[in-house]
Swiss-Prot record:
Belongs to the ABC transporter superfamily. Energy-coupling factor EcfA family. ATP binds at G42, H43, N44, G45, S46, G47, K48, S49. It is found in: Cell membrane. It is a peripheral membrane protein. CDD domains: ABC_cobalt_CbiO_domain1. Residues 8-242 form the ABC transporter domain. InterPro entries: AAA+_ATPase, ABC_transporter-like_ATP-bd, ABC_transporter-like_CS, ABC_transpr_CbiO/EcfA_su, ECF_ABC_transporter_ATP-bd, EcfA_1, P-loop_NTPase. Keywords: ATP-binding, Cell membrane, Membrane, Nucleotide-binding, Translocase, Transport. One of its GO terms (molecular function) is ATP hydrolysis activity. It comes from Staphylococcus aureus (strain MSSA476). It is an enzyme of class 7 (translocase). Its EC number is 7.-.-.-. This is Energy-coupling factor transporter ATP-binding protein EcfA1.
Length: 269
């Protein structure tokens, strides 16, 4: 398969957790554009988190194919390809493995047998990028949820990935911490040309994305830019998704534009 503009491609992928269970994913096909931010959204049970598990190899497809940089992912090449993909999970406490911040960032580098001098350099650079260098010697219980997620992103950045997956990474944060983390992710994407994949039920997060895939009942319901997706805002509510606040207000006021950020809403008012 030749698709130079996509980093990950799902082709007719189906998956079930048990052989006698219903399919969680049903003949799913989509492409993740290189260097862009793709948001995969859906309600609980839509199949979006299963997609993340397949991307990082926690689960394997039952039928269909997954391509990474035009290579079919197989048992033989998976470990090599997997090193290019980092993931940040929902609960920051569950992914903190070091006794202090800098040891947590170093953990993945140790597993990859990175030399000590290079490890020290990478840890410092990664923490600096996420504005956590001054807290390098802090214990995890001294950090807020948002700061822990910054450390998780630093741990991923230290490994020089091409792709970062955010699996509901903002869902346990307060609104300010959530927005700060999303701003950081956009900065990281821009500075390093990293592909971002956010798995979320929150359509507000999808407004940050370049490309949006909406999942429903194990299938791709809609796909397009954020503007294209929110042009069908009412349809999104019928599959259990909650519209972002500015779009709700926009509808109440009877404005024509479906897609609207907080800044745009303020300007419009």
């Amino acid at each position: 398969m030749e698709d130079k503009n996509s980093v990950i491609v799902f082709k007719n992928v189906s998956f079930q957790y048990q052989s006698d269970a219903s399919f969680t994913l049903k003949d799913v096909s989509f492409s993740i554009p290189k260097g862009q931010w793709t948001s995969i959204v859906g309600h609980n049970g839509s199949g979006k988190s299963t997609i993340a598990k397949l991307m990082i190899g926690i689960e394997k497809v039952k039928s269909g194919e997954i391509f990474y940089n035009n290579q079919t992912i197989t048992d033989d090449n998976f470990e090599k390809l997997r090193k290019d993909i980092g993931i940040v999970f929902q609960n920051p406490d569950n992914q903190f493995v070091g006794s202090i911040v800098k040891y947590d960032v170093a953990f993945g580098l140790e597993n990859h047998a990175v030399p000590h001098d290079e490890m020290h350099r990478r840890v410092g650079e990664a923490l600096k990028q996420v504005d956590m260098l001054e807290r390098a010697d802090y214990e995890p219980n001294a950090l807020s949820g948002g700061q822990k997620q910054r450390v998780a992103i630093a741990s991923v950045l230290a490994l020089n990935p091409s792709v970062i997956i955010l699996d509901e990474a903002t869902s346990m944060l307060d609104p300010d911490a959530r927005q700060n983390l999303l701003d950081l992710v956009r900065k990281v994407k821009s500075e390093h040309n990293i592909t971002i994949i956010s798995i979320t039920h929150d359509l507000s997060e999808a407004m940050e994305a370049d490309h949006v895939i909406v999942m429903n009942k194990g299938t791709v319901y809609k796909e397009g830019t954020a503007i294209e997706i929110f042009d069908h805002a009412e349809e999104l509510t019928t599959i259990g998704l909650d519209l972002p606040f500015p779009i709700k207000i926009n509808q109440m006021l009877g404005y024509q534009t479906s897609f609207l950020t907080y800044e745009g809403l303020v300007d419009q008012l």
